[in-house]
């Protein structure tokens, strides 16, 4: 890959500048308030839609910006450096757009896609269950065919936007005998459908402002037209999106790490102890250097995965590497940033405190980092070491 293209090409510079302006002018002034109030930011998402950020990879003839995966992660990184929750929300919405555009029928896309792309509509994705997290084979939600309809029963937990969305992609077994790969189906369940119950909003450690709820389905009737694409394709459809989502998580992590480095450099330059700025002490210098090196290395891993995605090449290994490396480092950098800021870093008023809380989930969602290591171990065992 020609990385100079990512760094110097005018198109990418323009995209980075545009994302940086959006993040600094629209997102940054609201970031702290969003975290404190824990309220969703409809207006920011609407603005992101108007600017083409939500549908950045969607072809122009589908109403998107027609950009590539590298453009997508560039925007995510810039936004995450000011507000991880806004970046994470935009990443989730891009996933919903991708699912609908790749696998939806023409009627489904015509009805639902435009509102998602322009930021007026919101979707949710119901996958995780009380007994099914990393192991989706334990899924208990079922959609049993009864003549011309499917009867949906079960529950979902940790569903982002489940209480504010227009519709939900719900993963359910339609035929357990066919197993995980061929027996699961994604359904489009519209909000307000009889039999859908939405639980109270969860109180979270981080990503405050992104609502998280449980869902219950009680004999909820669905037509064949509610199937996303074709019956039995739910699991492969989701797996198809993970290369994108894991690369996006890497970008979120780099945004957090970059902010940690900036804050620490500024603080350590003005804070003095023993008649010297903190940045003059080798212990501090080495922590800052480690952040700088690991951010640069992580960005290369992220760009490699994004480049392969843009080329329509398989990049599961590269995406898992990027997600694992960048998210582990984001947590480490946020921890070290609190250490550098000392007692101030531990206060709610500290700029690091929110980043520390938001960083943790990057090691958990879109496949825990333990799962990423399992994936990479399998890849190493079967592929040539280059």
Positions of the model-derived regions?
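Alpha-helical interface subdomain recognition
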Residues: 1-82, 86, 103-108, 115-120, ...
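Short Gly/Pro-enriched turn/cap motifs at secondary-structure boundaries
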Residues: 89, 116, 131-134, 158-161, ...
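A short, Trp-centered hydrophobic/proline-enriched beta-strand micro-motif
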Residues: 119-127, 171
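Long, acidic (Asp/Glu-rich), low-complexity accessory segments flanking structured domains
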Residues: 218-237
């Amino acid at each position: 890959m020609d990385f100079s293209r990512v760094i110097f090409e005018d198109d990418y510079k323009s995209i980075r500048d545009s994302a940086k302006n959006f993040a600094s002018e629209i997102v940054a002034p609201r970031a702290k308030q969003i975290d404190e109030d824990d309220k969703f930011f409809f207006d920011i998402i609407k603005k992101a839609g108007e600017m083409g950020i939500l549908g950045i990879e969607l072809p122009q003839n589908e109403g998107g910006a027609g950009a590539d995966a590298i453009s997508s992660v560039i925007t995510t990184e810039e936004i995450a450096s000011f507000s991880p929750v806004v970046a994470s929300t935009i990443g989730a919405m891009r996933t919903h757009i991708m699912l609908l555009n790749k696998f939806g029928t023409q009627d489904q896309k015509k009805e639902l896609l435009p509102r998602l792309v322009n930021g007026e509509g919101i979707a949710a994705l119901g996958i995780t269950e009380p007994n099914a997290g990393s192991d989706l084979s334990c899924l208990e939600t079922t959609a049993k065919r009864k003549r011309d309809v499917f009867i949906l029963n079960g529950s979902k937990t940790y569903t982002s936007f489940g209480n504010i969305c227009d519709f939900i992609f719900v993963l359910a077994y339609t035929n357990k005998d066919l197993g995980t790969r061929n027996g699961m189906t994604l359904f489009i369940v519209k909000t307000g459908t009889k039999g859908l119950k939405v639980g109270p909003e969860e109180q979270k450690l981080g990503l405050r402002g992104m609502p998280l709820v449980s869902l219950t389905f009680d004999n909820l009737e669905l037509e064949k037209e509610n199937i996303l694409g074709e019956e039995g394709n739910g699991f492969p459809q989701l797996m198809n999106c993970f290369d994108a989502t894991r690369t996006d998580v890497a970008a979120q992590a780099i945004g957090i790490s970059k902010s940690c480095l900036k804050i620490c450099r500024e603080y350590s330059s003005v804070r003095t102890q023993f008649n010297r700025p903190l940045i003059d002490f080798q212990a501090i210098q080495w922590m800052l250097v480690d952040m700088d090196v690991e951010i640069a290395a992580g960005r290369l891993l992220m760009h490699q995965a994004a480049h392969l995605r843009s080329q329509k090449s398989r990049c599961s290994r590269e995406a898992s590497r990027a997600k694992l490396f960048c998210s582990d480092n984001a947590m480490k950098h946020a921890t070290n940033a609190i250490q550098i800021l000392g007692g101030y870093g531990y206060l709610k008023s500290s700029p690091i405190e929110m980043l520390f809380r938001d960083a943790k989930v990057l090691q958990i969602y879109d496949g825990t980092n333990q799962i990423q290591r399992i994936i990479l171990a399998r890849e190493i065992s079967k592929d040539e070491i280059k």
